[in-house]
Design a protein with these regions (language model features):
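Acidic catalytic/metal-coordinating carboxylates
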Residues: 41-45, 68-72
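Charged docking surfaces used in two-component/phosphorelay signaling
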Residues: 24-32
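Non-catalytic signal-transmission and effector/linker regions of two-component phosphorelay proteins
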Residues: 1-14, 115-133
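Receiver (REC) domain active-site loop signature in two-component systems and cognate sites
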Residues: 64
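Active-site residues of response regulator receiver
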Residues: 61
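Conserved acidic carboxylate
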Residues: 17
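Short hydrophobic/Thr-rich beta-strand motif most characteristic of the beta2 strand and flanking loop
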Residues: 34-41, 49
Length: 133
């Protein structure tokens, strides 16, 4: 069964990003691409949402106050094992750590073009759909 771009529309994304401007920018871009996005400013704020709603993708910065993105991804896996994880970060060393600790997660390094973000999100969601089938 082939999936087109419209199959991703309304996919539920939880965005955890502590930088207000970046968070707002990402929400606008993802919503414009057709995704439903809930956004929080730290990992600890994401936990109640993960408990109350199913998300297709957790899109998280890695370096955040209170709870970093790697710990958030581990908690997400405990709460909702079928939620895919994708990290965004501006730190190369953090990217290596994330790749070791969350080997199935995609890591996108800042700066990135919004088109690249949307393409990577679609790839991750396509992999999720393929795994379900």
């Amino acid at each position: 069964m082939a999936f087109g771009m419209t199959d991703f529309h309304r996919a539920q994304i939880l965005l955890a990003e502590d930088d207000d401007a970046m968070r707002s920018y990402l929400v606008r871009a993802l919503e414009k691409a057709g995704f439903a996005v809930d956004a929080v400013d730290r990992g600890t704020a994401a936990l109640p949402l993960l408990h109350s709603k199913h998300y297709d993708l957790l899109l998280s910065d890695i370096v955040m106050p209170e709870m970093d993105g790697i710990e958030l991804a581990q908690r997400c896996n405990e709460i909702s094992a079928d939620t895919k994880v994708m990290f965004i970060t501006g730190f190369a060393a953090v990217t290596l750590k994330a790749s070791r600790e969350q080997p199935l997660a995609k890591v996108l390094s800042k700066p990135f073009h919004l088109k690249d973000l949307v393409l990577e999100v679609e790839r991750v969601l396509e992999d999720r759909i393929s795994a379900i089938l």
